[in-house]
Design a protein with these regions (language model features):
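N-terminal "arm"/small-domain region of PLP-dependent enzymes with the aminotransferase-like
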Residues: 1-51
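PLP-dependent aminotransferase class I/II
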Residues: 35, 204-288
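Phosphate-binding glycine-rich loop
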Residues: 50-98
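PLP-dependent aminotransferase-like
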Residues: 91-148
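Active-site pre-lysine segment of PLP-dependent enzymes
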Residues: 114, 132-141, 154-177, 181-212
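PLP-dependent enzyme catalytic core of the Aspartate aminotransferase-like
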Residues: 162, 309-313, 317-318, 322-352
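Conserved PLP-binding catalytic core of the aspartate aminotransferase-like
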Residues: 270, 279-313, 329
Length: 352
């Protein structure tokens, strides 16, 4: 049986895992759960699930467009950011083409590019940050897209508005810059980029957002892209019909209106990242300053060798060997009770 070698050579996605009895804090899910308004909207919509969903997602696109002060034709809703990445690669990548990104970042950029036979050219992080200058050096005549995850997954680090703009000015305007802002809702740094402003100045910019994190809808698989209408239209042509289910659409629309859930999530994340950052530092444990809903910290040994022990004590975190960071862990910021339990577990480690 002849199968495509580019598919056979791909590595399977490694998700965050857990075990029975442990609290799962390995996948950056919202510790408060889904928006109550979203749950109510899903319950109300259940009697209509025998009908096909709105294949254009026009209601949701219009509401997202209102938040961004853009027309709906600048918005594409899809079955999570993963599908958006595949649609992006579908319209840009052929065998012989390449994309540029960071090595220690979200693996689905690599997956989407290789799925269509392209080459992923990667630059290692520089002090935990995207090496933007180094990434520019990887561009050649076959480069179609550059991926920037800001804040970065799994480090939680970010490039500032000035740094990102300097980078965008150097990127040839025929190369798409895909700015993944899955965690941008959590960013509170004063110099964090305003991507809406950047869209006006850089027509080759595409922004990715998700409902999985701050809105707590990871199980419904829904995300969106913001870009020039011509680009959005091309991606829409590559999408499967009815790719976003009706429950995801109504939940997302309701979640957008739930300011109480959003504000509560932000309060928890901002309070607990400060608490945990200070406590890890007291213990001599290095962690990156985070602008996301997780914190990335380092131990003296490979996390894979102690993951089961930590999970057995009650916390399932993410070991980062698949990211090329075997001695680092990514921990979703949970409640104070969960975070204190993590610290207790770390205190009990024979060596850190």
């Amino acid at each position: 049986m002849n199968m495509k070698p580019n598919i056979l050579s791909m590595e399977a996605y490694v998700p965050g895992r857990t075990i029975e009895g442990a609290t799962k804090l390995s996948s950056n899910e919202n510790p408060l759960g889904p928006s109550p308004l979203a749950m109510a909207a899903v319950k109300k919509a259940l009697p209509e699930i025998h009908r096909y969903p709105d294949g254009t997602c026009i209601g949701l696109r219009a509401e997202i467009g209102g938040l961004w002060e853009l027309d709906a034709d600048s918005i594409l809703v899809a079955n999570g950011s993963d599908e958006l990445l595949i649609l992006l690669a579908a319209i840009l990548i052929d065998p012989g083409c390449n994309a540029v990104g960071a090595r220690q970042t979200f693996s689905q950029y690599r997956y989407a590019v290789r799925l269509f036979g392209g080459e992923m050219r990667e630059k290692s992080l520089l002090s935990g940050l995207h090496d933007l200058s180094g990434m520019l050096e990887l561009i050649n005549s076959d480069t179609k897209v550059i991926f920037v995850c800001n804040p970065n997954n799994p480090t939680g680090t970010y490039r500032s508005s000035q740094e990102l703009e300097s980078f965008l000015r150097e990127v040839p305007n025929n190369i798409v810059v895909a700015l993944d802002e899955a965690y941008a809702d959590f960013a509170d740094a004063g110099d964090f980029p305003n991507s809406r402003t950047l869209l006006t100045e850089y027509p080759n910019l595409l922004i990715l957002r998700t409902f999985s994190k701050i809105y707590g809808l990871a199980g419904l698989r829904i995300g969106y892209a913001v870009a020039q209408p011509e680009f959005i239209g091309a991606m829409a042509k590559a999408a499967m019909p009815f790719n976003v289910n009706s429950l995801a659409q109504v939940a997302a629309r309701a979640a957008l209106t739930d300011t109480g859930h959003r504000e509560g999530t932000l309060r928890l994340v901002h309070t607990e990242k400060e608490f945990l950052g200070v406590e890890l530092s007291k213990r001599g444990i290095f962690s990156y300053p985070t602008q996301a809903n997780f914190i990335c910290f380092a131990l003296e040994q490979k996390i894979s060798g102690i993951w089961e022990w930590i999970a057995g004590k009650g916390i399932a975190l993410r070991e980062l060997s698949s990211f090329g960071l075997p001695k680092m862990a990514r921990y979703t910021l949970g409640s104070r009770v969960h975070n204190q339990l993590l610290l207790k577990i770390l205190d009990e480690l024979p060596t850190r």
